[in-house]
């Protein structure tokens, strides 16, 4: 299938079938060397969207590349089917960018059919992806992690599908799950490694800023942020 075809469905039955195909393609495996990390996010105002992607050097946090696209969509938000709304704008924003790992504001395999937005994008582009979300879509955890760096497994149908990860002492934990070509351990490790300010990994934080506020703000934020210890 071509990249865009992973997101083309007109009925719920078609969306579910595509998700099942995505889940069958997903591979959870250790990451190879990572020299460039991307983040992608989509912001909305009504039916209008602004999708942004930012590529960083994971050692220096230098912004290596970025891209913003605008458009409209008539695909509504439905829990469990976010990929069909945000996937096409995200694909467009990522077009032409080079990176070794992609962070996605959404879920990977921590999804009812193991096929969240991060898994969709990973399979469509055949790149390693990690999903980072605000709250669980599926699964249960025994407790919230209490200290920065602590994690708690998220279990769904007897399987660990992700982790609650405490990345900020003042904010709720994020939900981390691998999307494609990445395993659970590397998803957590890279998420914690790349948090500098607030609760989100830096590629996602800057992609969110770019989608909402523009390139000049991203450049200033990137230069001014200190590395968290």
From Swiss-Prot:
It catalyses: Endonucleolytic cleavage at apurinic or apyrimidinic sites to products with a 5'-phosphate. InterPro entries: Endonuclease-V (IPR007581). GO terms for cellular component: cytoplasm. Transmembrane segments: none annotated. Keywords: Cytoplasm, DNA damage, DNA repair, Endonuclease, Hydrolase, Nuclease. GO terms for biological process: DNA repair. Its EC number is 3.1.21.7. The record marks 77 as: Interaction with target DNA. It is found in: Cytoplasm. PANTHER family: ENDONUCLEASE V (PTHR28511:SF1). Belongs to the endonuclease V family. This is Endonuclease V.
């Amino acid at each position: 299938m071509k990249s865009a075809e992973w997101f083309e469905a007109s009925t719920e039955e078609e969306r579910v079938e595509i998700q099942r195909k995505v889940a069958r393609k997903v591979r959870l495996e250790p990451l190879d060397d990572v020299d460039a990390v991307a983040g992608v996010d989509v912001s909305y105002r009504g039916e209008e969207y602004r999708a942004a992607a930012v590529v960083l050097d994971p050692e220096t946090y230098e912004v290596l590349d970025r891209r913003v696209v605008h458009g409209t969509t008539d695909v509504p938000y439905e829990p469990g089917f976010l990929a069909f709304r945000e996937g096409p704008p995200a694909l467009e924003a990522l077009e032409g960018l080079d990176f070794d790992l992609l962070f996605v504001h959404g879920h990977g395999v921590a999804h009812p059919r193991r096929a969240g937005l991060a898994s969709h994008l990973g399979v469509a582009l055949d790149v390693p992806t990690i999903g980072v979300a605000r709250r669980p879509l599926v699964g249960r955890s025994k407790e919230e992690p209490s200290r920065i760096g602590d994690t708690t497994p998220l279990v769904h149908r007897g399987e660990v599908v992700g982790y609650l990860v405490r990345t900020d002492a003042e904010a709720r934990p994020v939900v981390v799950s691998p999307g494609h070509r990445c395993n659970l351990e590397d998803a957590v490790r890279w998420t914690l490694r790349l948090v500098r300010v607030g609760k989100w990994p830096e590629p996602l934080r800057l992609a969110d800023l770019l989608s909402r506020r523009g390139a000049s703000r991203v450049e200033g934020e990137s230069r001014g942020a200190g590395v968290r210890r």
